[in-house]
């Protein structure tokens, strides 16, 4: 089962939580769900160069709070915050609600599954050899603290006549273990030969406590520890 199902969906409520965090009446649920899809599509298209990992949408009473996790927050914010204010106004028009926009920096994009998949897809579009792109991503992730990583590339790889799937793995990726903190991401590479799919699984260690927010909290704490250790090295 763990080999087939989305590893994030399998762990929801155990050590992962939802990216849309709100409740609604039966009549409003469909409308708000469509709004969430449109918001994500709009931001993904508008901020292609911002390396977006995920978009979290919360809806307190008659308000909307959008949090963008990005490896390049400067591109979203713009000069003196001008770009982020334009985005906020557009989102307010889309939702007809008072919308706030927050940016969270992803300090280690090399161990973020979605960003790894996007990077490999971009390299495939630039005609970089798929094996080289996969191995480079695996080495970077393992060097920066991942306990295991698996990458699948499928399609007409290298312009081959027959589509196939190639994969590369290093370390442990225990998909059946529910306490395992596994990040999962996908991307598509639109090449001259057709679309190639990229899937990435990153194993970041085990979470023993039963806490849906544990994975998110752990990522933030890891970023803070990394930045404080870097400051200590600079002071030394």
Curated annotation (Swiss-Prot):
Gene Ontology MF term list: mRNA binding; rRNA binding; structural constituent of ribosome
Q: Tell me which GO cellular component terms the UniProt record holds.
A: cytosolic small ribosomal subunit
Q: Which UniProt keywords apply?
A: Ribonucleoprotein, Ribosomal protein, RNA-binding, rRNA-binding
- Report residue spans for region: Disordered: 214-236
Spell out the SMART domains in the cross-references: KH (SM00322)
Q: Which GO terms describe its biological process?
A: translation
Q: Which SUPFAM superfamilies match?
A: Prokaryotic type KH domain (KH-domain type II), Ribosomal protein S3 C-terminal domain
Ranges for domain KH type-2 come to 39-107
Give the protein family: Belongs to the universal ribosomal protein uS3 family.
Q: Which HAMAP family match?
A: Ribosomal_uS3_B (MF_01309_B)
Give the multimer and partner information: Part of the 30S ribosomal subunit. Forms a tight complex with proteins S10 and S14.
Q: What does this protein do?
A: Binds the lower part of the 30S subunit head. Binds mRNA in the 70S ribosome, positioning it for translation.
Q: What name has this protein been given in UniProt?
A: Small ribosomal subunit protein uS3
Designated gene of the protein: rpsC
């Amino acid at each position: 089962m763990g080999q087939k199902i989305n590893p994030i969906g399998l762990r929801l409520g155990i050590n992962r939580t939802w990216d849309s965090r709100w409740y609604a009446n039966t009549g409003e649920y469909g409308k708000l769900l469509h709004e969430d899809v449109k918001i994500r599509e709009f931001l993904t298209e508008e901020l292609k160069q911002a390396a977006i990992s995920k978009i979290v949408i919360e809806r307190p009473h008659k308000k909307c709070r959008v949090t963008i996790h990005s490896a390049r927050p400067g591109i979203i914010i713009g000069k003196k915050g001008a770009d982020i204010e334009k985005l906020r106004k557009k989102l307010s028009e889309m939702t007809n609600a008072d919308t706030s926009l927050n940016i969270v920096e992803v300090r280690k994009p090399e161990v973020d599954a979605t960003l790894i998949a996007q990077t490999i897809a971009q390299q495939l579009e630039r005609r970089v050899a798929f094996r080289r792109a996969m191995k480079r991503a695996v080495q970077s992730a393992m060097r920066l603290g991942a306990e295991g990583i698996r990458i699948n590339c499928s399609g007409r790889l290298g312009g081959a006549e027959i589509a196939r799937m190639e994969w590369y793995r290093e370390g442990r990726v225990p998909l059946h273990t529910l306490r395992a903190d596994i990040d999962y991401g996908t991307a598509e590479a639109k090449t001259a030969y057709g679309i190639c799919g990229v899937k990435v699984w990153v194993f970041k260690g085990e979470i023993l406590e039963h806490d849906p927010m544990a994975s998110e909290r752990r990522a933030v704490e890891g970023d803070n520890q990394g930045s404080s250790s870097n400051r200590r090295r600079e002071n030394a």
